[in-house]
């Protein structure tokens, strides 16, 4: 838990420091805070059900059509119960994920964009960490409202933990 808090604090410091220097020279940086819903896919769906969470993201505009992003979040997926017949039910534990990702956004139009991110996910209960990638498509519904749909996968030696995610965010 201390590593997670330290990682989020470092990211927030870097984004804030970058934002302060960027605004003074006229370039744009945006922040967003969002709520996320995740639907497990692949092997992950056999042990987990729907997940909920939140995320923070900073975006530095390198041009009118492209941006560099840095994000951190928290998602919690509840564990499923599976009936083993005569042995009774087995309840899988919940899975909590803290993704820390860097990426690039390409705007196809004023409202529609593609977003690719890579980084690390940290898991609860001594689950360690894993390389993570997350391609997404999104739409700016208004100047401050952002919706995106993503596929996020964390690859570990024991397999892949993946989900389809929907993010609704307020941009400021």
Where are the predicted features?
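Predominantly the C-terminal beta-signal and adjacent terminal strand-loop region
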Residues: 24-26, 42, 74, 80-81, ...
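Detector for outer-membrane/organellar transmembrane beta-barrel domains
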Residues: 34, 59-79, 89, 95-103, ...
């Amino acid at each position: 838990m201390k590593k997670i808090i330290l990682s989020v604090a470092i990211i927030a410091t870097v984004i804030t420091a970058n934002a302060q220097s960027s605004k003074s020279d006229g370039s744009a940086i945006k922040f967003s805070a969002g709520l996320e819903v995740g639907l497990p896919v692949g092997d992950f769906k056999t042990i987990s059900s729907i997940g909920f969470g939140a995320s923070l993201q900073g975006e530095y505009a390198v041009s009118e059509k492209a941006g560099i992003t840095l994000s951190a979040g928290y998602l919690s997926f509840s564990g499923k119960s599976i009936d083993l017949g005569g042995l009774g039910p087995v309840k899988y534990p919940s899975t909590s994920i803290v993704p820390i990702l860097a990426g690039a956004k390409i705007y196809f139009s004023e409202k529609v964009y593609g977003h690719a991110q890579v980084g690390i996910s940290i898991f609860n209960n001594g689950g360690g960490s894993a390389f993570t990638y997350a391609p997404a498509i999104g739409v700016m519904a208004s100047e401050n409202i952002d919706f995106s749909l993503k596929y996020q996968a964390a690859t570990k030696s024991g397999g892949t933990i993946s989900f389809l995610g929907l993010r609704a965010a307020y941009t400021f």
